[in-house]
């Protein structure tokens, strides 16, 4: 954190497709005056910094450069996108062992630098890695946020906007739970222009089967994109920019994220997708969405799935480190 008033610094760890898309989105929006890129492939970070600085005359002044973990010491926000990418046919949970190991090598030098800002985690499986970031860093839960279901919620709003012929910005609907195969659409509390979505669907002859198909298409959209172009990055890069903006501008914005559960939804000691208030302190509070009985079960089942994978992954990492 600089001595200059209103000077904000962000460090990006992981300069792959998601990281570089996030960096570009931040440059486009003119958010943060100082932006540092860290990656094991140093030459790429130098190239991206040089490329991105050429955008600044068209957007806003910004110091963009290739850096090291030591640059985290005075950062306001550290964004972690580093990790092995999801391959065709591979679920996000399949990535857990590889990416827990990578994460463990990142967090120590970041924390050792003296960093005391906010962590925003986007590497997959994001709910698992967000929990691990909180656990390994020793940071307060409010200062560790996951991108969670931000992208899934955007996908749901896009699909519903198309179905009901409204702007996705006008759709107030959330995907909840794991960022992955056990996620679900919270249709019971969804609205368009304050009117319940289920009521609109009934009036317009949209069946529950059609809504289930939309939910399924959202759940599988990442796999569709990966099969066609190898990876997803523009959507999640923009979602990360939006969360970063809420933090750095102290917005108190209600956003879909991965948040620590402390009794909400009857869940404890887990990070999972939910609406939450995001501001300059990080995660201000969780907003517990009202759920139908069926949705409550889906939330519980999603948490059970995550907890099993989390426990197995952390145990495997501990065994590896003990050898």
Swiss-Prot record:
Pathway-wise, it operates in: Fermentation; pyruvate fermentation to lactate; (S)-lactate from pyruvate: step 1/1
Question: Per the record, what are the reactions this protein catalyses?
Answer: (S)-lactate + NAD(+) = pyruvate + NADH + H(+)
Q: Which InterPro entries does this chain map to?
A: L-lactate/malate_DH (IPR001557), L-lactate_DH (IPR011304), L-lactate_DH_AS (IPR018177), Lactate/malate_DH_C (IPR022383), Lactate/malate_DH_N (IPR001236), Lactate_DH/Glyco_Ohase_4_C (IPR015955), NAD(P)-bd_dom_sf (IPR036291)
The EC number(s) this enzyme carries: 1.1.1.27
- Sorted alphabetically, which Pfam families does this protein's record hold? Ldh_1_C, Ldh_1_N
- Per the annotation, which location comes first and is thus the protein's main one? cytoplasm
Q: Which pairs of positions does the record mark as disulfide bonds?
A: none
| UniProtKB keywords | Cytoplasm, NAD, Oxidoreductase, Phosphoprotein
Positions annotated as active site in the UniProt record: 179 (proton acceptor)
- List cellular component terms (GO): cytoplasm
Residues involved in NAD(+) binding: 18, 39, 44, 69, 83-84, 105, 122-124, 147
Please, one GO biological process term?
glycolytic process
Q: Which residues bind substrate?
A: 86, 92, 124-127, 152-155, 232
A GO term for molecular function: L-lactate dehydrogenase activity
| Family per record | Belongs to the LDH/MDH superfamily. LDH family.
Q: Which NCBIfam families match?
A: L-LDH-NAD (TIGR01771), PRK00066.1 (NF000824)
Mind telling me which PANTHER family this protein's record contains?
A: L-2-HYDROXYCARBOXYLATE DEHYDROGENASE (NAD(P)(+)), L-LACTATE DEHYDROGENASE
Q: Subunit details for this protein?
A: Homotetramer.
Protein name listed in UniProt: L-lactate dehydrogenase
Question: What is the protein's species of origin?
Answer: Pediococcus acidilactici
Q: What is the lineage of its organism?
A: Bacteria, Bacillati, Bacillota, Bacilli, Lactobacillales
